[in-house]
Amino acid sequence: MTDSKYFTTNKKGEIFELKAELNNEKKEKRKEAVKKVIAAMTVGKDVSSLFPDVVNCMQTDNLELKKLVYLYLMNYAKSQPDMAIMAVNSFVKDCEDPNPLIRALAVRTMGCIRVDKITEYLCEPLRKCLKDEDPYVRKTAAVCVAKLHDINAQMVEDQGFLDSLRDLIADSNPMVVANAVAALSEISESHPNSNLLDLNPQNINKLLTALNECTEWGQIFILDCLSNYNPKDDREAQSICERVTPRLSHANSAVVLSAVKVLMKFLELLPKESDYYNMLLKKLAPPLVTLLSGEPEVQYVALRNINLIVQKRPEILKQEIKVFFVKYNDPIYVKLEKLDIMIRLASQANIAQVLAELKEYATEVDVDFVRKAVRAIGRCAIKVEQSAERCVSTLLDLIQTKVNYVVQEAIVVIRDIFRKYPNKYESIIATLCENLDSLDEPDARAAMIWIVGEYAERIDNADELLESFLEGFHDESTQVQLTLLTAIVKLFLKKPSETQELVQQVLSLATQDSDNPDLRDRGYIYWRLLSTDPVTAKEVVLSEKPLISEETDLIEPTLLDELICHIGSLASVYHKPPNAFVEGSHGIHRKHLPIHHGSTDAGDSPVGTTTATNLEQPQVIPSQGDLLGDLLNLDLGPPVNVPQVSSMQMGAVDLLGGGLDSLVGQSFIPSSVPATFAPSPTPAVVSSGLNDLFELSTGIGMAPGGYVAPKAVWLPAVKAKGLEISGTFTHRQGHIYMEMNFTNKALQHMTDFAIQFNKNSFGVIPSTPLAIHTPLMPNQSIDVSLPLNTLGPVMKMEPLNNLQVAVKNNIDVFYFSCLIPLNVLFVEDGKMERQVFLATWKDIPNENELQFQIKECHLNADTVSSKLQNNNVYTIAKRNVEGQDMLYQSLKLTNGIWILAELRIQPGNPNYTLSLKCRAPEVSQYIYQVYDSILKN
């Protein structure tokens, strides 16, 4: 009977029986009992109470039983750290066992037990195993070093294990070399500035030698390591490429992709005119094509990587377009990827084949695939000018099929073709107008309206067509409403005498009957333009439009170079850099392609070093200026020196969906603000009675837990078409977060959320896009924690801590204001030295000192100091003068502004006196509000 019998028991109270069996004298009985325990553990039963009994079974020569006991230990050691110590002696003993399998098993298990108390006992056995005579033990010990480093990095460095790992790179056994490289690479990821691997020509030669004899996963580790090396010149790059090229014919697709990554990177260093360069390009094509004969899942990963390769070097696969033709039994995700690559490889030479394929695809039954195929025909027309006429003819044939979704997608595509080739294919407009009644999708309706408005002078009944859309104006989507408004204004400017009533009707609907601010504002712009200067209006609205680009979905070059360095990893499948989706990856080293002529440090300089130094200097805050003007200048791309956010992530989202011109006239109305942070009365200016600080005692230690303001409703549902947003701000582990709750009180689901901040006093911006990946259903709420940073554009606001926010979803764009409690902007390095504090206090002019009263506070000086230190307000010194406690404190804001404080506490008096001094006195009243909130919380 198989081991499945252990999973079929339904007995109650079996723990007692298992305990007895584990202590049985017979070895077979104990082995059976341990198997039952492991089975119970596997199905989720709590068998932690058997810990001492299972540990007793470690003293055995039976390898199978030992493995089972070790498995149990790994699972329960974290919850029973004190009892896990019992097993240490057995581990140490097993590390010296004659059997290398047992030695390796022991050191591997000790590395998997993530308990601090055990790590100190692991050092000596691990040191022996790293020098063990058996390669199996050495390779296991190498991985154990990486695991131990993750638990206690300092101890690994102090014990010299990193040096031992480096020594293993020269080991005679290739698997030991591979594991040593894997361990060092893993450690390097968390310490990007350390040169742990010390890659030099000698080490590279050792790795290339080991590459031929490794297992497939060992080869992947070594190839990934090689991809991080920057050869000193093109000769060395060519030499490495020659030794890596045989890996392209490996059976394992992961090895192939790792080899492709190395070659793609080193191609940058080879002279393009050389014969070897062209030969290497030819060698890269067959293995990539071979990957497409695997399982669908492997095909998908390969296609996502090929998509990047084609964008970087289309010449590699330009002759292989046929392998990307879709097969009838391909899954939809493979079909869509193949379609994308086909368009990227389309050229004048192969466009006839591509169009024939696409026309065939447009008759398939899968709606999503058909839509993408029709869109692809349009992309071909835009990309290959010589094929445009043939593409338009193909689209007209598809429109004649009268298949609803095909017709609608074709009209959207034809609009783009009109934009690319103005005044060339307008003869087909009559055919398009025949299908007006069948259009029910917003994109298609908007496209048709745009065509009618743009070519109104060529359509006899353009006014009737647009008027038919106007009948259900309020039922249309925002996209259609905005397009219709613009189209009718265009029509009026072309035929003013015939359409005056129509334009007045649409302007009235847009400005008076609509509650959509984008639509209202665009309506007012047109109204004012038409009423003040019709000539200028004509120049603005009917101006010549820029031609649309060939490829609108190309990845931004810098990001593409980084993704090429991550071929074969998740980043290449997501088309996002690792720090965009790996939690806690702020320290991940950004990779870059090397620069030609072998600049050795091209890929080694960490990104963002200038940012760190610039943050130390206080930022100059410009005046607030015109709010509307600044809203027009909202930067929809990412902050240029924020390494955590890629340009594709934030740059791809345009919150102002109706276009930037829709914001003119839009005002932000602050929502209700908690009274806690209401502006205080203007404080009195006083002089200080500060004396010599050198006699003062030291501050108080820190206790956990900073102040978090209570959540407030920032955006009521009545003002946001059913979307309610409440929230607050927090400061955790050195990072600022915007904690929000989104509630859908509407009758329809909400999707496509995005967020944008206006310029503000402290440069606060989101570090990552808003992460709401699933639709928000009616009456559903979701909590979102949005990481923030202070590297954005700066503009002085009134009040100073005011933050203006735009939130977009599939319904509309909504605006609200909230106040940032300044304690979330207090940084961890805000503690001054006492001498510096005294000198700074004296250096700041007396007129910058402001005094406040904190009323009804019943805390002693130690508690006050502790509460404030939890919020990064540091007590520099404390003394008692005539029974009155005096606390001298410092804090620092994210923009580099220092604030010095003197807090006087009289025992028995609930009113405290707070004196604040800083070089930007307008900040002081907000600091007082924070003090008041923290101490009364």
Swiss-Prot record:
InterPro entries: AP_beta, AP_complex_bsu_1_2_4, ARM-like, ARM-type_fold, Armadillo, B-adaptin_app_sub_C, Clathrin/coatomer_adapt-like_N, Clathrin_a/b/g-adaptin_app_Ig. The keyword Disulfide bond does not apply. Disulfide bonds: none annotated. The modification Phosphoserine is found at S4. One of its GO terms (biological process) is endocytosis. The keyword Transport applies. The modification N-acetylthreonine is found at T2. GO terms for cellular component: clathrin adaptor complex; clathrin-coated pit; cytoplasmic vesicle; plasma membrane. The modification Phosphotyrosine is found at Y737, Y928. SMART domains: Alpha_adaptinC2, ARM, B2-adapt-app_C. Keywords: Acetylation, Cell membrane, Coated pit, Endocytosis, Membrane, Phosphoprotein, Protein transport, Transport. The N-terminus is blocked. Phosphorylation at Tyr-737 by SRC occurs at the plasma membrane in clathrin-coated vesicles (CCVs). GO terms for molecular function: clathrin binding. It is found in: Cell membrane; Membrane, Coated pit. The modification N6-acetyllysine is found at K265. It is a peripheral membrane protein. Component of the adaptor protein complex 2 (AP-2). Adaptor protein complexes function in protein transport via transport vesicles in different membrane traffic pathways. Adaptor protein complexes are vesicle coat components and appear to be involved in cargo selection and vesicle formation. AP-2 is involved in clathrin-dependent endocytosis in which cargo proteins are incorporated into vesicles surrounded by clathrin (clathrin-coated vesicles, CCVs) which are destined for fusion with the early endosome. Belongs to the adaptor complexes large subunit family. adapter protein complex 2 (AP-2) is a heterotetramer composed of two large adaptins (alpha-type subunit AP2A1 or AP2A2 and beta-type subunit AP2B1), a medium adaptin (mu-type subunit AP2M1) and a small adaptin (sigma-type subunit AP2S1). Interacts with EPN1. Interacts with EPS15; clathrin competes with EPS15. Interacts with SNAP91; clathrin competes with SNAP91. Interacts with CLTC; clathrin competes with EPS15, SNAP91 and PIP5K1C. Interacts with LDLRAP1. Interacts with AMPH and BIN1. Interacts with ARF6 (GDP-bound). This is AP-2 complex subunit beta. The lineage of its organism: Eukaryota, Metazoa, Chordata, Craniata, Vertebrata.
